[in-house]
Amino acid sequence: NHITKGQNSTLARALRLIKEDKNRNAKYLMHQADFIVANLLNKGGLSDENNTLKLGYDLKKNDWPEWIHRTGFKKYLLPKVYPVGAHLGKLNEVIANELGLNKKTNIYAGTTDGNAGFLASSKFKIGSAVTSLGSTLTVKVLSEIQIEDSNIGLYSHKLGKYWLVGGASNTGGNVLEKYFSKNQIINLSKEINPNNSSGLEYYPLANIGERFPENNPERKPQLIPRPKDETLFLHGLLEGMAKIEKKSYEAIHQLGGSFPDHIITVGGGSKNLVWEKIRMRIIKTKISSGINIEAAVGAAKIPFLFGN
């Protein structure tokens, strides 16, 4: 029951890289954040609990699981893992001179861009919820307990003494862009009455396959019947995505998390106020757009929230 299950997981991609390294020239396996840290410290082989989660790191044992070596991993490739906010060292003097930075600058273990976005846009308290409406739809809820179920694509990141529970659906802006231009979406949205139902029961996907709230690579899009009225079609798509969002939060709630009384929205879809009203009607909770939505803002908060 681990998030590494599946051919598109980080673990699967890492195994492919290892297979391609036929001469075994690699010394470390790195995420992008690890690569940046290695350059700032002039020392590789370090990572954080969030970036390594989908690679297989065991948050309960605070160690790499035994089974990971049976997949083909060599122990020397796996990074030493630190909690988010752990002090990793001082900025390398050579790098400090090159970048014009203070040589006393501290380097801390970071997080994923999605988690940093959550920290940027939401208050760090139990029950805080953020939906990201980008090319895909991602939901995250801060919880006191770890919640995970690989059967539906649900997992938890560790942030301090709490857990950031979430999952990502394949629905989202990529579906809208398949049928409409950005200007069409803006103009047609103005013609939609968000208080009324479209009467359409859609499961909007751009392609076959879903990750969350059901982990089903064979899941087919449900976009029938297709009305001739483009406004009605868009209405149905927006409602379908709102229903997937609701189902996502319900799945977290059923497994012990909080159902949000307020959802912060980030991403391009947060600008569509008609969609926001449709979501409020269907999910039956308060929804508003995030003020600080840049992941860099969340990353800057890490030393103050979790630093040691």
Report the location of each language-model feature:
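Active-site core segments that coordinate phosphate-bearing ligands/cofactors
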Residues: 1-4, 9-32, 37-43, 54-72, ...
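Helix-loop-beta segment of a Rossmann-like dinucleotide-binding subdomain
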Residues: 45-51
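Short beta-strand to alpha-helix junction loop
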Residues: 60, 84-87
